[in-house]
């Protein structure tokens, strides 16, 4: 399990050499390879099969996994089987799972045609999450937000198929509010309803109807789930940014999914009180501000809602903070090798989520024939945004000082000792006997590569500004994969698999 996302604002202004590295397709400090983005896309989706909880389907492709968590929810007399383990542990955390579902869906919504033959695989990955979220919200005014005792789970190193730690169930309700996790769940269901609108209209309607009800609950009973369930969800997934950003985020997705005027009015009415003016260069399972601004800006750029012009201004400011040398905006830091970098663990979660916003916004700008305004005469074209996003994807796939891919199973060199229980322990097929809580300690401490490849998993990656990476299980901040690293990466890989050559991008 990852420690909570560290929200540290970048303060370093990147040198001119890094600007060249990021914006020029030819001038990079590593040898750029010809990447098979389609293969990487396929593998990034396959990763989610390794994170599945519940009864696995006949078409399960990662065969070293088996059924697990078949009695989840029984402690509360509800069915909470299914869903995803968030990372390398065996707990189901609803907050990051919902964000994962939202971002997978956003990728399909914006870049669906680019998924090509992998579109159905991606929809299945979304549905594994939304099916679970429907179970977790089946009781009115209640959202079941976690299954498993994180502290007990983290004291063990055992396969999900063997886990014997308490499967404690945690929920938010009117007496124990959790507007943040509930509104994110509503966003996930609303986004999912768009994904399945044509493929399964009946399911799409059920998702949207539930999203509406869950958002109403989130808004009516306000409060952070970190207060209601502090001992259960902290420090793993405390919501440090508060719940106001999730309420705006949920309303934005419900407006996009339903086109109901009430959600537009909600955003308009609550823009100030819920902090929409906060232009923060962060986006992830905890903080939604940058995502809100990009998502709502599409309405402005498409000429559908000029009232929300302030969101576009915020989105432009955010983009300028990612483009070194373009403006005087406070800048995100980049490593010497060109990796977008934030201090703390699991840096790749920032890399993939911020890169996704760069790509999504670049497409909105292209369709509107617009540019990013950075003030004082500075501006950036959509192509510049795409180049930065592509540079980050290429770094992940191997164009970096270590010449290694940070995606398991992609390329000749990739992490072999990832911090992941199921991957690091012998499979049930290879070792049918149960491995108990402490029985996995020897495997955890072993210097041997993991016996089971969690294909497609992207690890946390370099966590300092030196591009260094110790391929070690114990350094979980760098070696642990998460669902919310891969979720935004799917859309990025889909786009670049269909549009790999910057020279062929439309001139902006």
UniProtKB/Swiss-Prot annotation:
Domain of life: Eukaryota
Localisation per UniProt entry: Secreted
Any single GO CC term annotated in Swiss-Prot or TrEMBL for this entry: extracellular region
Stated induction or repression of this protein's expression: By auxin in roots.
Gene Ontology molecular functions: cellulase activity
Keywords annotated in UniProt: Carbohydrate metabolism, Cell wall biogenesis/degradation, Cellulose degradation, Glycosidase, Hydrolase, Polysaccharide degradation, Secreted, Signal
GO BP terms, alphabetized: cell wall organization; cellulose catabolic process
InterPro entries: 6-hairpin_glycosidase_sf, 6hp_glycosidase-like_sf, Glyco_hydro_9, Glyco_hydro_9_Asp/Glu_AS, Glyco_hydro_9_His_AS
E.C. designation(s): 3.2.1.4
Active site: 89, 419, 471, 480
UniProt enzyme class: hydrolase
Signal sequence bounds: 1-33
Pfam families xref list: Glyco_hydro_9 (PF00759)
Catalytic activity, as annotated: Endohydrolysis of (1->4)-beta-D-glucosidic linkages in cellulose, lichenin and cereal beta-D-glucans
Family: Belongs to the glycosyl hydrolase 9 (cellulase E) family.
Matches recorded under PANTHER family: ENDO-1,4-BETA-GLUCANASE
Name recorded for this polypeptide: Endoglucanase 6
Record organism: Oryza sativa subsp. japonica (Rice)
């Amino acid at each position: 399990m990852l420690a909570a996302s560290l929200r540290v604002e970048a303060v370093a202004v990147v040198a001119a050499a890094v600007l060249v590295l990021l914006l020029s397709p030819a001038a990079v400090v590593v040898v750029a390879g010809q990447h098979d983005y389609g293969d990487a896309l396929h593998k990034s989706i396959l990763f989610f099969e390794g994170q599945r909880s519940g009864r696995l389907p006949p078409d399960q492709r990662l065969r070293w996994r088996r059924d697990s968590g078949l009695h989840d929810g029984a402690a509360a007399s509800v069915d909470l089987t299914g869903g995803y383990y968030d990372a390398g542990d065996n707990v189901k955390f609803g907050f990051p799972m919902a964000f994962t579902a939202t971002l997978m869906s956003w990728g399909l919504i914006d870049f669906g045609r680019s998924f090509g033959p992998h579109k159905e695989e991606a929809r299945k990955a979304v549905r594994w999450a939304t099916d679970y979220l429907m179970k977790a919200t089946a009781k009115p005014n209640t959202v079941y937000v976690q299954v498993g005792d994180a502290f007990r789970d983290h004291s063990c190193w055992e396969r999900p198929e063997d886990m014997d730690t308490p499967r404690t169930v945690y929920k938010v309700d009117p007496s124990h509010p959790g507007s943040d996790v509930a509104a994110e769940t509503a966003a996930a269901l609303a986004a999912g309803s768009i994904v399945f609108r044509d493929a399964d209209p009946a399911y799409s309607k059920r998702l949207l109807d539930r999203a509406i009800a869950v958002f109403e609950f989130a808004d009516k009973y306000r409060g952070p789930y970190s207060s209601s369930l502090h001992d259960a969800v902290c420090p793993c997934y405390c919501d440090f940014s508060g719940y106001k950003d999730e309420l705006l985020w949920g309303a934005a997705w419900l407006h996009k999914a339903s086109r109901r005027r009430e959600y537009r009015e909600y955003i308009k009415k609550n823009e100030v009180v819920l902090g929409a003016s906060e232009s923060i260069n962060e986006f992830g399972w905890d903080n939604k501000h940058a995502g809100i601004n990009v998502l709502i800006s599409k309405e402005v750029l498409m000429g559908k809602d000029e009232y929300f012009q302030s969101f576009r201004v915020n989105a432009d400011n955010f983009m300028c903070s990612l483009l070194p040398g373009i403006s005087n905006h406070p800048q995100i830091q980049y490593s010497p090798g060109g990796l977008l970098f934030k201090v703390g663990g699991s840096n790749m979660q920032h890399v993939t989520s911020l890169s996704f916003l760069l790509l999504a916004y670049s497409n909105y700008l292209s369709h509107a024939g617009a540019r990013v305004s950075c003030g004082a005469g500075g501006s950036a074209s959509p192509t510049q945004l795409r180049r930065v996003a592509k540079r980050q994807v290429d770094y992940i796939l191997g164009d970096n000082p270590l010449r290694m891919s940070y995606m398991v199973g992609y390329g000749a060199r990739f992490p072999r000792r990832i911090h992941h229980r199921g991957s690091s322990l012998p499979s049930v097929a290879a070792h049918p006997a149960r491995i108990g809580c402490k029985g996995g300690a020897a495997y955890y401490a072993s210097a041997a590569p993991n016996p089971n490849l969690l294909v497609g998993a992207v690890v946390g990656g370099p966590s300092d500004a030196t591009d260094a990476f110790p391929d070690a299980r114990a350094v979980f901040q760098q070696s642990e994969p998460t669902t919310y690293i891969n979720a935004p990466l799917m859309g990025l890989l889909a786009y670049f698999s269909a549009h790999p050559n910057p020279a062929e991008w439309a001139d902006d």
